[in-house]
Structures are given as C-alpha cells and as structure tokens.
C-alpha cells in the first residue's frame, strides 16, 4: 500500500507491503532482499553523494540476488511541496545530495502475475545525519 499525507503544504510518501493468508518462502525471501536493498541505499545517503550511488547500492544487491530484471524503477525521489520532486535516485542521476533534501528510498521487486514487494520510507538529510 502506498500512503501519503499533506501537512502544512508538504507531502509525505511511504509504502508498506502486506499479505492475506499464508506467505510462501519466495515472497519472504523477496521481502528480505528488498529490505536489505533499502538499507544499503540508506547507508549511502549523505551530503555530497551522487544520487546514482544510492541507487546503485540497492540495484546491485537486488541484481546479486537474481532479481535485477525485476527492479523496474528508480530507487527514490525528492518529496516536498510536490509528491515527486528533485533530486531523483536513479541509475543515470548525477544530482548530488545536499543538507535539507528530503528523499524517498523505495526499492522494489515485481514478479508479473505473481506478486511485488516495495518498501518506501522518507529520509531527511542534515549536514551530519540522515533521519528516517
């Protein structure tokens, strides 16, 4: 489920995964891969880092696990007055992160006709930290 709210003119954006009934081992494994990919990307977020590096961290992990072709979008985007803003965390993005940026980190794996998993959180960059 993709959730969001607008408070004081600013957007939020997050996604959570859920299932009804028994969850098979492949879905549990895919969820774990996506969660680890998100953590890998979050570990790269800091001022001065190119957005493509955070994307690469998530994408390489998913690819190593055999699902590279099933990761069909960028890793994240800026959020603010608009729901989708700059900077963009994608393979080709040369944008550089800076203090004050608010970005989503939302890797996903999508297996058509079966299931998909995406985990999305927002991160606020300060000079010294990333706040989730």
Model-derived segments and spans:
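Active-site neighborhoods and metal-handling regions in enzymes and metal-associated proteins
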Residues: 1-132
């Amino acid at each position: 489920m993709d959730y969001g709210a607008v408070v004081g003119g600013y957007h939020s954006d997050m996604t959570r995964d859920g299932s009804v009934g028994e969850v098979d081992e492949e879905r549990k494994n895919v969820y774990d891969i996506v969660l680890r990919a998100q953590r890998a990307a979050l570990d790269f977020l800091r001022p001065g880092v190119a957005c493509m590096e955070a994307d690469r961290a998530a994408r390489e992990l998913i690819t190593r696990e055999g699902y590279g072709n099933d990761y069909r979008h960028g890793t994240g985007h800026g959020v603010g007055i608009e729901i989708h803003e700059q900077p963009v965390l994608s393979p080709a993005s040369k944008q550089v992160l800076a203090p004050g940026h608010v970005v989503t980190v939302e890797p996903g794996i999508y297996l058509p006709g079966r299931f998909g998993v995406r985990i999305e959180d927002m991160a606020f960059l300060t000079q010294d930290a990333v706040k989730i």
